[in-house]
Amino acid sequence: MPKKKDEFTLMRSLLHIKHRNVRWSNFLIDSAIDCNLVEKRALYLISEWVKINFVSRNLGVPENWKELIMHFTDEDLGVIGGKKNIPRTYQALKQLGKKFIAVEYTNEKGQKIKGRIHWIDAFYYNTVTKVYDVRISPEILPYMINVKGNFTTIDIGEAMSFASKETQKMYEFACKYSGDYRYSDRLSKEMGF
């Protein structure tokens, strides 16, 4: 499938990803979903894709959420999890489809609604084109698009550079409670490391 000149491609995005910011609702930061390092890196890149395709183009309304399919190649999977870990990255993407986040909200009638949502609806692999298609769940988008209050800004390039899921989570909490986000390289310099 040929790509348009301005179309988001994972590889092109990764060349410029350092210090790119995405907003997550604090609900996502505080959720009890347990992701490993590679799964979380995939979520950061999904967030970047959503930002480029829906926030930057001002398509953040439900009518535009029909085309929620992100395409990956083996090269893209290698960037997420390491060139020698493509099968592990493939497994991580499949696992994200099984992980649910508990949600609660009040509907327009004032009724409290409880449910469970996930990041990925479906995951496909085309054996001919060797392209992985990941369909993002539209239910997660309100927590990533047009978030105006109770959100955390994350530098995804920074977050992807960490080597453990615990460090990633700590960075998310640091961003949440710092009032602004901070890059670890500047923080390390200030602390004398």
Describe these PLM feature segments.
Residues 1-193:
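Charged, alpha-helix-forming regions
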